[in-house]
UniProtKB/Swiss-Prot annotation:
ATP binds at K600. Zn(2+) binds at C890, C893, C910, C913. Its EC number is 6.1.1.5. Monomer. A motif ('KMSKS' region) lies at residues 597-601. Keywords: Aminoacyl-tRNA synthetase, ATP-binding, Cytoplasm, Ligase, Metal-binding, Nucleotide-binding, Protein biosynthesis, Zinc. Its cofactor is Zn(2+). This is Isoleucine--tRNA ligase. One of its GO terms (biological process) is isoleucyl-tRNA aminoacylation. PANTHER family: ISOLEUCINE--TRNA LIGASE, MITOCHONDRIAL, SOLEUCYL-TRNA SYNTHETASE. The gene is ileS. A motif ('HIGH' region) lies at residues 57-67. It comes from Lactobacillus delbrueckii subsp. bulgaricus (strain ATCC 11842 / DSM 20081 / BCRC 10696 / JCM 1002 / NBRC 13953 / NCIMB 11778 / NCTC 12712 / WDCM 00102 / Lb 14).
Length: 931
């Protein structure tokens, strides 16, 4: 037998390389075949629930890194909650109605205006379900576990029926009304938009200053050559002007410039004078805003049109002139002010953004609104009322789907009245927990400031508004009509609205005093898609999915404070008086490595599927766990490669632990904690602390700290310390020796506990690790998080070993200096004498019996007594003297020993190794030992 054959070298088939792109798919198939998701829930039946309600992604296109961040975070939470013992189901969902799907059909050459509506909607449904199937495959490939065979989908009949009932309950409670008021209007999609469907981009717009001649100053202001001065960025709205708003709290100045007088806000006067080039002007009069109410101006270029002066507190002195042009059909503030003063709404624009015959200037009829800016400018100039024209860049509202500008346009729509139950909503926000905490303020302020919700849309693909109209135009919505429509939708889906005549959509024998002839018509608009997803708390129940209400958590991107978090809260409070969630967790956006938004034009997008093919889903999952996603997070291939290095470190550490516990049977070889060597007890205590802190961080949804703690433990406590000196015990000591079994106990425990703690983050790899451990559960996901032990001596151990670690640092510094001086090469070439300080000596006394030489990986260690030699190095905890070790290298333990050949039967070995080999391999005493 050769010397190396006497060593207890670790062996394992656990591969060094994960080959993740190939093997992950195999593991995922096994999870599905073995029904691990269902079995985990079965284990937790009857336990406290944790329900994470999935915010439905839109079923259109390939998944992106934002999807990956979101879905993996949810999966980490659900897995960790299940491993804590909660009953934590996960039911994925999809949002399947809306304009993007219509746009995709248009790209395929489908013209909805030439088709039967029901047939067109069937094409939309088919396309949406194809997208669901594609995304379902991609999400599962990220390692996300859930009830993928029974998702909730907003186009499913039962879901649509539930949504109709939510609408009906809101109507019954008095929260739904029809009105004509300005809403965001997308001419590019020919539909209204909710606030959540609007995004902002920089555009270049006109900036013009216009004078309105005073017609009636009510005896307080001269009409002769006197003008009200306004500023606007929308010249196209000037023909529809109905009034001028002033702030009742502001002071105004009448200034003389040449032969004209202008009324300007006093605090804006100097800025306006500079812009208009008034080198000299004279203030001739002061007015209060209240003085000007009900004064009348002439339209700046349309004969016979007047403009009323009205009070409005929203007028600011941040920009402009302190007087604001008001057109009731093209602005929410304009509308509200005009209504207070008894105006009719003037909104002379069609669905495509072109002016209708209602416009007071007939030259503009049929023209696209922005094309009229130049015409209006020229007419103002000809009338002598254009004082200044320039352009400037500012942020303007755009349709989030088409990326085209939107306008405020007054149209007849259906609304949810937020004002009627705003206080209830705000009260529910106060009772909700937010991660991060600032989310509470953000959502609170959005609800506090938001106007009524326009819920009708002029599109084809969506859930129809379940409203009928009588012969006299009266809208009809009753409990009976809602239930009848909902029951029909539950059987046939919402396409029934378009395939059945109105008589079949109404309850049998339905009558109304408003239809003496029994004739009715049905609404053609559909519900806002945010009403779809905002009703998901109800739809998922109607589908019989395993999600309780109110649910434990909603988790989405921070844009959903104005989207899904918002709409879900409104529908739930409006119908049941409670928030649909107990907690809300929001995430930032995924940016590239330089902090830029990802876009195809910049070429900085990363597709999760491409990463999976190159590196594996585990690398994406580890990236998700490593970042603080409460804000925006960067991702690039370079960043993912760095994450991959971290993964490799984790994998190799597990491989070492598995190899060196391959001959360890925890049932018969385990050493009880009280009998462990003190250094092993210390590592058990450190491991226990790691488990406790990790579970706390899982409960705080702080996965970055879980990863940091685990990686630090693996890198510092295991690789750089414990496993570094472990070879001297694991390889050299007797196979069944107490020291070796003690250390194997700790290493095995570390492998088991770390696998459990990392399982929610790296389920593929930890499942692979689990297959090499001797645990009873079939998969790590079927086990629970480790129990937290109560070690009575934990504090004493940490204090004593903490002092030793400081001493160790001093010894390592001394060894490094000896290396620099060429005194030694490897640390085992050294003989070290330590003269400990008081704190270190006290710690060493408490740890008496430990082999510190072994821990320091030196050939000889002496605790010096008496006077410290002059050549010793002085450090914080001790003085250290390093000499080259005497003796010869033992070929087995690689230490310098002076007792080689002490056992004549094994002359090559030192006394320690000879004794061990004789005990483990007595046959060698007969056969002899080769080098």
């Amino acid at each position: 037998m050769r010397v190396k054959d006497t060593l207890n070298l670790g062996k394992t088939k656990f591969p060094m390389r994960g080959n993740l792109p190939k093997r992950e798919a195999e593991w995922e198939k096994n999870w599905e075949d073995q029904k691990f998701y269902e079995r985990r829930l079965k284990l937790n039946e009857g336990h406290e629930r944790f329900d994470l309600h999935d915010g439905p992604p839109f079923a259109n296109g390939n998944i992106h890194m934002g999807h990956a961040l979101n879905k993996i975070t949810k999966d980490i939470i659900v897995r960790s909650k299940n491993m804590e013992g909660y009953y934590a189901p996960y039911v994925p969902g999809w949002d399947t109605h809306g304009l993007p799907i219509e746009q995709q059909l248009t790209k395929q050459g489908v013209d909805r205006k030439t088709m039967d509506r029901a047939a067109y909607r069937e094409l939309c449904r088919k396309f949406a379900m194809e997208q669901v199937e594609k995304q379902r495959t991609d999400f599962k490939r990220l390692g996300v576990m859930g009830d993928w065979d029974h998702p909730y989908i907003t186009l499913l009949p039962e879901f649509e029926a539930a949504e109709i009932r939510v609408f009906g309950k809101m109507y019954e409670n008095g929260y739904i009304y029809q009105g004509k008021k300005p809403v965001y209007w997308s001419w590019s999609s020919e539909s209204t938009l909710a606030e959540a469907e609007v995004e902002y981009h920089d555009v270049e717009s006109p900036s013009i200053y216009i004078s309105f001649p005073v017609k009636d100053g009510k005896g307080k202001l001269s009409e002769e050559n006197t003008y009200f001065l306004i500023w606007t960025t929308t010249p196209w709205t000037i023909p529809s002007n109905q009034g001028i708003a002033v702030n009742p709290k502001f002071d105004y100045s009448v200034v003389e410039v040449g032969d004209r007088r202008y009324v300007v806000g006093t605090d804006r006067l100097s800025a306006v004078a500079e812009i208009l080039g008034w080198d000299s002007y004279k203030t001739v009069q002061h007015l209060k805003g209240t003085d000007m109410e009900y004064m009348v101006a002439k339209h700046p270029y349309i004969e016979g049109r007047d403009s009323l002066l009205m009070e409005a507190v929203y007028v600011t002195d941040d920009d402009g002139t302190g007087l604001v042009h008001t057109a009731s059909g093209f602005g929410e503030d304009d509308y509200n002010t005009a209504m207070r003063y008894g105006f009719d709404v003037l909104s002379p624009m069609d669905n495509k953004g072109c002016f209708t015959e209602e416009i007071p200037d007939p030259d503009l009829v049929g023209k696209f609104y922005t094309d009229t800016n130049e015409i209006v400018k020229d007419k103002l100039s000809a009338a002598g009322n254009l004082l200044h024209y320039s352009t400037f860049v500012h942020s303007a509202a755009h349709d989030w789907r088409t990326k085209k500008p939107v306008v405020y346009r007054a149209t007849t729509q259906w609304f949810a009245s937020i004002s009627k139950f705003r206080d209830q909503i705000l009260d529910q926000i106060e009772k909700t927990t937010f991660y991060p905490a600032w989310g509470k303020t953000r959502l609170y302020n959005m609800i506090k400031d938001r106007g009524d919700w326009v819920i009708s849309r002029q599109r084809a693909w969506g859930v129809p508004l379940p409203i009928f109209y009588a012969e006299d135009g009266t809208a009809i919505v009753t409990h009976e009509t809602i239930e009848h429509v909902a029951d029909l939708f539950a059987k046939e889906g919402s396409n029934a609205w378009f395939t059945h005549p109105v008589e079949e959509l109404l309850p049998e024998g339905f009558t109304s005093e408003h239809s003496p002839n029994g004739k009715f018509t049905k609404e053609t608009d559909i519900l806002d898609v945010w009403f779809d997803s905002g009703s998901s708390w109800s739809g998922v129940q109607a589908l019989g999915r395993a999600v309780h209400y109110p649910t434990s958590m909603y988790l989405e991107g921070s844009d959903q404070y104005r989207g899904w978090f918002n709409s879900s809260l409104i529908t739930s409070v409006a119908t049941n008086g409670v928030a649909p969630y107990k907690s809300v967790l929001s995430q930032g956006f995924t940016l590239d490595g330089q902090g830029r938004k990802m876009s195809k034009s910049l070429g900085n997008t990363i597709a999760p599927n491409d990463v999976i093919k190159q590196m594996g889903a585990e690398i994406i999952r580890l990236w998700v766990a490593s970042v603080d996603a409460s804000g925006d997070v960067g991702v690039s291939m370079d960043i993912l490669r760095q994450v991959s290095e971290g993964y490799r470190k984790i994998r190799n550490t597990f491989r070492y632990m598995l190899a060196n516990t391959a001959d360890f049977d925890p049932e018969k070889d385990r050493v009880a904690y009280k009998d462990l060597c003190k250094i092993d007890q210390y590592l058990e205590v450190k491991l226990n602390d790691l488990v406790a802190e990790s579970i706390v961080n899982y409960d705080k949804y702080d996965f970055a700290d879980v990863y940091k703690l685990v990686f630090k433990f693996i890198t510092n406590d295991l690789s750089a310390f414990y496993l570094d000196f472990a070879k001297d015990v694991l390889y050299i000591e007797g196979k069944d020796s107490h020291a070796r079994r003690s250390m194997q106990t700790v290493i095995y425990d570390a492998a088991v506990k770390l696998a459990k703690i990392l399982a929610p983050i790296l389920p593929h790899t930890m499942g692979e690790v689990w297959g090499y451990l001797k645990e009873k559960e079939e998969d790590v996901y079927l086990s629970n998080f480790p129990e937290i032990e109560d070690y009575a001596d934990a504090d004493d151990l940490k204090e004593s070993w903490g002092e030793f670690m400081k001493l160790r640092d001093d010894v390592l510094k001394a060894l490094e200096e000896a290396r620099d001086q060429k005194l030694i090469g490897k640390s085992f070439e050294a003989s070290v004498t330590v003269y400990p300080g008081e704190a270190a000596k006290a710690a060493l006394d408490k740890l008496a019996g430990e082999d510190f030489r072994e821990i320091l990986i030196v050939s000889n260690l002496v605790m010096g007594q008496g006077e410290v030699p002059a050549e010793a190095k002085q450090f914080d905890q001790a003085s250290v003297l390093v000499r080259r070790a005497e003796g010869e290298v033992c070929p087995r333990c690689r230490m310098y020993r002076t007792d080689l050949g002490a056992d004549s039967r094994l002359p090559q070995l030192c006394g320690r190794c000879a004794s061990i080999v004789a005990g483990d391999h007595p046959e060698i005493l007969e056969e002899g030992l080769e080098d």
